[in-house]
Structures are given as structure tokens and as C-alpha cells.
Amino acid sequence: VGVQKAIDLIGTGNSIQDAVTEALDRARLSLEGITSFEVQRISGVVDGSTAGYEVQLRIWFTLLERMHG
């Protein structure tokens, strides 16, 4: 059984789904072994007739076990 670690990230987008996808895609660029995520907070910004969304995620991943020699 591996050790899990969690980090918090914020994604933005034109929809809540876009904001979640952006955060997960960015996490995948530097993290291996992502196992789950939880939406911590959803907020939005209105600029005229356009709404933008910001989603804070907690992302869990398994720490890699490497042998040092």
C-alpha cells in the first residue's frame, strides 16, 4: 500500500467542468499516480454578460517508492 499525498489547486474556466478539467490537466503535467479529487470551493466572477468560474480542488496522488543506492 502506497502513501497518499494531497495538494490544493485552483482551476478557472467558462464553466465549472472546464475549471475542474483545467486543474486536473495541469496536475497531470507534473504529478504521477493521481487517484482522486474533491471540489473544495466553487466561485464565480461576472464581467458584463460573461461569467467565469473558479474551482478549488484537493487532488490526491500516490507517492512513488524509489530505491536509492
Where are these regions (language model features)?
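Short, well-ordered alpha-helical segments
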Residues: 2-37
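A cross-kingdom feature marking charged/low-complexity
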Residues: 38-69
